[in-house]
């Protein structure tokens, strides 16, 4: 379901949304998922860009425009069998985002072509996206993708007052049962990263630890916990950079 919303105000979701399939939401002025709100869908995409087209055969979504709005998530959002994607100049997550065995992306890039998970690759492909109005990403809540992929990416230019990415919450791609841990990427192409939360990519009983990649063009300050443990019964540790 594609919903291009042309409104002078942010779209406010204060109650519940339930859907089995993919839900695409576009509003240049942003979105507010209020405290106590609940979203349970197959997959969710919310962006301040205009969605020009979607190719169901390749999973390619073409974004245009740089909406100035913010996406602020304070509620519980769950993708039962797919992905969650937030694409806006500013993103604040103080709620819970969950996509078991799926992919979650928070990105300030809102121009170009985005490739959805399950098509050209395992997870989101944001290589062809860019932005001219990026600000920051703040993560204070919980993000989990059991054995899946989480990307937090900002190309905002770092200022003296604010890092491009600031994460104090939980980020978890550990897998339950047997299997390998997932993949986490936190990328600040033009700015700094401050990380003081817990980041986990642990294996299950039998499996290898996953991968945690944190790269900042300017400064990186990490005072939190980073874990990519191998399985409790068998398996090797993962990779942290």
Describe every region a protein language model picked out.
Residues 1-241:
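Extracellular and secretory-pathway beta-repeat/beta-biased strand scaffolds
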